[in-house]
């Protein structure tokens, strides 16, 4: 039996699946991956992306932060791909209980997923730091320089977790809950290099830990099933 056939059999036998995904889930929708060879970290800017996407850079160089953010982080024309849609189908069928994602693009919800735990926030939520008014991603995209609140003139910040910022505690606790209760944990499209997110797999207690990634990860030896392939290729074969 091939590794993909084994995977399909596992999905069939499971009814408490959790999917934990990273940038590789959205690359097939045309959204750049930070850490892949042709990803954002290997492109040339005045500052490395991890510096630009930090809290201190946002505070001290807000306009420059937003120039990069609009250019590279707001991919509003991107559409969900096969993996997003299959995960939504699995949830609708009652087999998948949660999607835990490191992505900020909102494509899981666009595909129909309901229970999505966004560890790093979402580009679709933005708020005024002064009065708390919320704004959508289009407002940010269409504004010039530093976006300001149309009610009070306050500075607007995206609801995304920047470097030097902590993850939302409730989202983390929810992720731990779902992963610790899962009978199958599928991890896809993540280098498993960012903590505390990568540490979440320590909470999985089952024997169906599946890693789907084109490249190797530090956790490969812990997987019950390792599939080195594109996510779309694998998920495209699931029949719900």
What are the residue ranges of the model-derived segments?
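Conserved catalytic core of sirtuin-type NAD+-dependent deacylases
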Residues: 1-240
């Amino acid at each position: 039996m091939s590794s993909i056939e084994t995977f399909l059999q596992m999905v069939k036998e499971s009814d408490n699946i959790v999917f934990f995904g990273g940038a590789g889930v959205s690359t097939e929708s045309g959204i750049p991956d930070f850490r892949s060879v042709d990803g954002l970290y290997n492109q040339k800017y005045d500052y490395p992306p991890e510096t630009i996407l930090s809290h201190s850079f946002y505070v001290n160089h807000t306009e420059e932060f937003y120039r990069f953010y609009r250019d590279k982080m707001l991919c509003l024309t991107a559409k969900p791909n096969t993996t997003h849609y299959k995960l939504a189908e699995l949830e609708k069928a009652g087999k998948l209980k949660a999607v835990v994602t490191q992505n900020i693009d909102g494509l899981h919800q666009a595909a129909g997923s309901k229970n999505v735990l966004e560890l790093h926030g979402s580009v679709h939520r933005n708020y005024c730091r002064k009065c708390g008014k919320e704004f959508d991603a289009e407002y940010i995209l269409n504004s010039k320089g530093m976006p300001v609140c149309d009610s009070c003139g306050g500075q607007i910040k995206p609801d995304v977790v920047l470097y030097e910022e902590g993850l939302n505690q409730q989202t983390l606790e929810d992720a731990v809950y779902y992963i610790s209760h899962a009978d199958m944990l599928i991890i896809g499209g993540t280098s498993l290099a960012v903590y505390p997110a990568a540490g979440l797999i320590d909470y999985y207690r089952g024997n169906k830990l599946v890693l789907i990634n084109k490249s190797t990860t530090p956790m490969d030896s812990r997987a019950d099933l390792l599939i080195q392939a594109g996510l779309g290729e694998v998920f495209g074969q699931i029949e719900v």
